[in-house]
């Protein structure tokens, strides 16, 4: 009886190691994937990776008004939040396969 228990334990450990490697690979892929957040009808674009690192900010010339810096700040903020939301969704989609069936609040 002990022998079967040990075999199951080894099998479980191997499955866990495999899953851990797959999760690590998915994390690496997240770093390479990008998402784009926009605001003002595309006047401001923010590009982030799946790890929520901002990689690029693009601002169209037409939206730059020295008399209204606050509007530009709002657009940059909105585009950044849009990009970060999309990065969260991407991470949840990619990592969700590993947490399927587990109900761990706040994990992804």
UniProtKB/Swiss-Prot annotation:
Residues 19-34 have a biased composition (Basic and acidic residues). It is found in: Cytoplasm, Nucleoid. One of its GO terms (cellular component) is bacterial nucleoid. The keyword DNA-binding applies. SUPFAM superfamilies: YbaB-like. Its main location: cytoplasm. Keywords: Cytoplasm, DNA-binding. Pfam families: YbaB_DNA_bd. Coiled coil: none annotated. Homodimer. This is Nucleoid-associated protein GWCH70_0020. It comes from Geobacillus sp. (strain WCH70).
């Amino acid at each position: 009886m002990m022998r079967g228990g040990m075999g199951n334990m080894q099998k479980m450990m191997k499955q866990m190691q495999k899953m851990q490697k797959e999760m690590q690979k998915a994390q690496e892929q997240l770093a390479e994937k990008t998402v784009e957040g926009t605001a003002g009808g595309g006047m401001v674009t923010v590009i982030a990776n799946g790890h929520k690192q901002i990689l690029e900010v693009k601002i169209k010339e037409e939206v730059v008004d020295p008399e209204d810096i606050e509007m530009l700040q709002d657009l940059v903020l909105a585009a950044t939040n849009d990009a970060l939301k999309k990065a969260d969704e991407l991470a949840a989609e990619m990592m969700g396969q590993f947490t399927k069936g587990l109900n761990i609040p706040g994990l992804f």
